[in-house]
UniProtKB/Swiss-Prot annotation:
Keyword Cell wall biogenesis/degradation: yes
Enzyme class, first EC level, given as a word: hydrolase
Protein name: Undecaprenyl-diphosphatase
The keyword Membrane is assigned to this record: yes
Note: Bacitracin is thought to be involved in the inhibition of peptidoglycan synthesis by sequestering undecaprenyl diphosphate, thereby reducing the pool of lipid carrier available.
Keywords for this protein: Antibiotic resistance, Cell inner membrane, Cell membrane, Cell shape, Cell wall biogenesis/degradation, Hydrolase, Membrane, Peptidoglycan synthesis, Transmembrane, Transmembrane helix
GO biological process: cell wall organization; peptidoglycan biosynthetic process; regulation of cell shape; response to antibiotic
Membrane topology, from the record: Multi-pass membrane protein
Coiled-coil positions: none
Role of this protein: Catalyzes the dephosphorylation of undecaprenyl diphosphate (UPP). Confers resistance to bacitracin.
Family per similarity comment: Belongs to the UppP family.
EC number: 3.6.1.27
Localization per Swiss-Prot or TrEMBL: Cell inner membrane
Classification of source organism: Bacteria, Pseudomonadati, Spirochaetota, Spirochaetia, Spirochaetales
Length: 266
């Protein structure tokens, strides 16, 4: 397959599936199996940087607000209004989520060789069930004021989301709603907690960059990143709209359809 077409497909899939609750890693694995498309480390780094840039742009005002609150807190110039307290709690929550996500992610990485094609299909079904439960009123526990417990649960879930076929956004939003957070807040927590995880992952992969085979030139790599960025902007807006309108079950239907189709083809 022509490299230009490969990078366009990879950029499209990464941009769409990173934010929609359908598992980007699961879909990239499907591409690898059926279209013989692999994802070199250097290209993986560019694609993830492009998608995290989408989150930063989409939540730029919120991120700036949190950064300013944190700086004022460090400089002891914070007036500690109710809003300031809420923002500090969110920062603390994201830090706790990041810590436990890293722990679970490191543990799961050790068993990467066990990520079989059948496991991906099974995880697609698990994700579809979680999305279905979000829309059909799961039992909600009021633990959102317990920052540590909330961070622990969401962090563990986000770590599990590293498994191909499990949607990171889907499972973290499920956990947040289960804890009593609103849909809007759950979405914010899910996307903001993605930023430190992606940057941490890119930092760890940086050394591998020089050990990998470069099969794409710089133009092709940038082209893939641009496609990931453009379709990422589209998919994050679509996901926000569908979550607010209680239509995540569409993604459940999609995932079950994918599993059925793949099972039929294989």
């Amino acid at each position: 397959m022509d490299n230009i077409l490969r990078v366009i497909i990879l950029g499209f899939v990464q941009g769409i599936s990173e934010f929609l609750p359908i598992s980007s890693s699961g879909h990239l694995l499907l591409l690898k199996k059926f279209m013989n498309i692999d994802l070199p480390i250097v290209f993986d780094i560019y694609l993830h940087f492009a998608t995290v840039l989408v989150v930063i742009i989409y939540y730029r005002r919120r991120i700036l607000e949190l950064v300013m609150v944190f700086i004022k807190f460090i400089l002891r110039k914070l007036k500690m209004t109710e809003l300031d307290s809420s923002n500090l709690n969110l920062i603390l929550l994201i830090l706790i989520i990041t810590f436990f996500t890293a722990l679970i992610g490191i543990f799961i990485e050790k068993f990467k060789v066990l990520f079989t094609f059948k496991l991906v299909l099974f995880n697609f079904i698990v994700t579809s069930i979680l999305l279905f439960l979000i829309e059909f009123r799961i039992k909600i526990f009021n633990f959102k004021k317990n920052i540590f417990f909330s961070g622990l649960l969401i962090g563990i879930m986000q770590g599990i989301g590293a498994m191909p076929g499990i949607s990171r956004s889907g499972i973290t939003i499920f956990a947040s709603i289960l804890l009593g957070f609103s849909r809007t807040k759950s979405l914010e927590i899910s996307f903001l907690s993605l930023i430190p995880i992606v940057f941490g992952s890119l930092f760890l992969k940086y050394n591998d960059l020089f050990k990998s085979d470069i099969i794409f030139n710089i133009f092709e790599i940038n082209l893939g990143a641009i496609f990931a960025f453009i379709f990422g902007l589209f998919s994050i807006s679509l996901f926000v709209k569908m979550l607010k309108n209680s239509k995540l079950y569409y993604f459940s239907i999609y995932l079950v359809s994918v599993v059925s189709l793949v099972y039929f083809l294989v």
